[in-house]
Amino acid sequence: MKIVNTLILIGAGLAAHAPVQARIAEYQLDNGLKIIVQEDHRAPIVVSQVWYKVGSSYELNGITGVSHVLEHMMFKGTENLEPGEFSRIISANGGRENAFTSRDYTAYFQRLEKSRLPVSFRLEADRMRGLKLNEEEFKKEVQVVMEERRLRTEDNPEALPYEQFSATAYLSSPYRTPVIGWMDDLKNMRLEDLSSWYQQWYAPNNATVVVVGDVQSSDVYELAKEHFGPLKPSVLSQVKPQQEASPKG
């Protein structure tokens, strides 16, 4: 899993060379799910992404890093899939997949041959509301994230000072906490923290599906209705605005 702090181009490599006047279609299902489609017919490939409007800036003290740990756990099984089966299915269909967490969002994506888009939608819809959080898998993934933090931050002579600088420079903004979380919070994280976070934010009315590739927009919309339409929306928490304190002097 890769943490990034800036928006990636929609559709990765496909969108990098897309026509300037590319046609973009937008839809919204009755349950609140937003759908954005950009047609690109130069190759029989499709990139499908699901963006959730939640990231490290939403986290409270004591559970920093929960968004990123949950990102890892999204690959560890649902009511219908065993741990790791999501990735195995994508690979068996000739695809590639990954995910990333940032301050304001968490996103998951797959790149597949265009006829395999239903596979992506079926799997993403399944884990949007049917994730099965397992204590044993959770303990392993927290250790993975802690090691990731050691490697990328604590043992990095450039990253560690920058993290400390950000925590000092931002007095009240939620951007002061690292996306990966503070080590003490990771050590003390509980499965219940992830479960609450998942139930709170992972819902169709807090998600946007983005599809770029050799598709017809209307077909993508119908496919989204089939797979995501039955999912029930959630009552989303109102995020209290947190603005940085005004500088003085």
What annotation goes with each model-predicted range?
Residues 2-9:
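Sec-dependent signal peptide recognition
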Residues 18-56, 80-116, 152-206, 230-249:
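Non-catalytic beta-strand/loop surface segments
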Residues 55-60, 130, 217-218:
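Short beta-strands and strand-coil junctions in structured, solvent-facing domains, enriched
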Residues 77-80, 111-142:
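M16/insulysin-pitrilysin zinc metalloprotease superfamily fold
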Residues 132-150, 216, 236-249:
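Acidic/histidine-enriched alpha-helical segments
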